[in-house]
């Protein structure tokens, strides 16, 4: 039977969330702090569960990256992955590499933007294969980021929908999933084997 392994990214394969780290890397510390200060009213509402998480995330993303040239954004994503490999959990990377080496189909399923997730896995130790990255995608128009997302935030039930899209015929493979948060619950429940906070 086919073996499919799916990994959450932030907090599962990394030590922390990467959104804030990426904003700081791409925009600088002071611009980040100013942006968060301007965004604080609806961030507070989000923390009080009075404003949807995905809308808050998109507004924050639009503030920092709306209007950026796509090439500039992709270059910042690649540079971020190169300079922040310390964020990765080595035990998680080893498990991912083992799955690839043994011939499993592997995907990273993340609410983070796939542009900065994918470069972390350009080279996985011990294998020439790469995992598929199923992340939140950004919308572009005429070579620039609009600040909006082209797909729903890849969180909760959306993770399962994206897995089904890439790996249909659910009865024909064994699914192993790794996650660490509420946003991974549906994915872990959908799997034959689900591991919660496995690399800590």
Give the role of each language-model region.
Residues 1-49:
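Active-site neighborhood of HAD-like aspartate-dependent phosphohydrolases
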Residues 1-4, 75-76, 82-200:
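C-terminal cap/substrate-recognition subdomain and adjoining C-terminal extension
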Residues 44-49, 56-65:
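Helix-loop "lid/cap" segments that line or gate small-molecule binding pockets
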Residues 47, 81-82:
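Short histidine/acidic/glycine/proline-rich micro-motifs that form metal-
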Residues 47-53, 133-136:
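N-terminal short leaders/motifs
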Residues 58, 71-74:
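Low-complexity, intrinsically disordered basic tails/loops
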Residues 63-64, 73-77:
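N-terminal, charged amphipathic alpha-helical interaction modules
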């Amino acid at each position: 039977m086919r073996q499919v392994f799916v990994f959450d990214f932030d907090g599962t394969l990394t030590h922390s969330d990467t959104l804030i780290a990426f904003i700081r890397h791409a925009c600088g510390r002071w611009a980040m702090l100013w942006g968060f200060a301007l965004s604080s009213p609806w961030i507070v509402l989000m923390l009080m569960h009075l404003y949807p998480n995905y809308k808050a995330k998109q507004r924050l993303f639009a503030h920092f990256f709306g209007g950026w040239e796509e090439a500039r954004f992709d270059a910042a994503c690649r540079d971020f992955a190169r300079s922040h490999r310390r964020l990765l959990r080595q035990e998680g990377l080893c498990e991912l590499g083992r799955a690839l080496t043994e011939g499993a189909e592997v995907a990273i399923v993340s609410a983070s933007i796939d542009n900065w997730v994918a470069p972390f896995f350009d080279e996985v130790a011990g294998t020439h294969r790469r995992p598929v990255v199923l992340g939140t995608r950004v919308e572009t128009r005429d070579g620039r980021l609009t600040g909006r997302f082209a797909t729903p935030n890849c969180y909760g039930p959306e993770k399962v929908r994206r897995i089904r899209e890439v790996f249909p015929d659910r009865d024909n493979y064994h699914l192993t999933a790794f996650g660490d948060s509420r946003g991974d619950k549906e994915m872990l429940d959908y799997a034959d084997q689900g591991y919660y906070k496995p690399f800590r």
